[in-house]
Amino acid sequence: MNLIKNGKKNLEVFKISKSEFKNLDRKIDELVKKLLIELKKKKLFLAAMESCTSGGLINAITNIPGASEVIKGGLIAYSDQEKIVHGVPKKLIEKYTVYSPEVATAMAHQIIREIKGSQIGIGITGILSRPDPKYPSKKVGQANIAVIFKEKTLIKKIYFPPQKERKKAKAIIILKTLETIREIVK
């Protein structure tokens, strides 16, 4: 999978500071409300394949009334095997690792294929709180988000300070994913 389009690398990198972890629930709710308005207005539906956020993105959206008008569905593909079962090529995982932007992009493509009627596909993968012995080169505190809409693909690589609470790490990834969805549909 090639992350270079038109001679430009299709990947943005963000380093999250500790101060950005304040008031995450409020920030997420506010962003979801804005996103719901935009998606309803444009009659768009989304679907997500989530790994490290364990369904947290879909949960955050469905916490706000009106989510059923924009969500087609989602799936949690936590293990490598589950990603493969849902169409992420095993060779892609072996070449780039399960935590890569390439795998996040494949997850986003596959969820659109799997959940019919979705125009926006989201793939989220990352390593939150413990090193993975299968992938020793991957450090704790990183995630990759891919959002696909029409012919556009936005990929965000996020680095954040390791958190004692996994909930906070998931929340920052969810916030950045919501921002990316808004960015791609504008």
Model-inferred region functions:
Residues 2-186:
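Short alpha-helical segments enriched in small residues
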